Amino acid sequence: MRARRTLLYVPGSDWRKIEKAASLGADCVCLDLEDGVAPSSKAEARTLISKALSELDFGRSERLVRVNAADSGQQAEDLLLASHPNLLGLVL
């Protein structure tokens, strides 16, 4: 089991920050769909996160996605990202 010393949360709606996070070498990068994203930007954030997981080199960083709460009306859409092959897991 690998030790995880750093966990970097990044708003999923900000491509520039996602790109930067991919290059920093954190043990885990958590792409946030919950508090870090305005309600009006949730759909765009899902698209950016999917693009980032497909196109960016995160090196050895584990990739996680923090999904919205079950009662938010957003979680079902968020969970579609769970099947992405470059995603390690979800943060509930």
Predicted feature descriptions by range:
Residues 1-92:
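Expand to "…catalyze enediolate/carbanion chemistry for C-C bond making/breaking, isomerization
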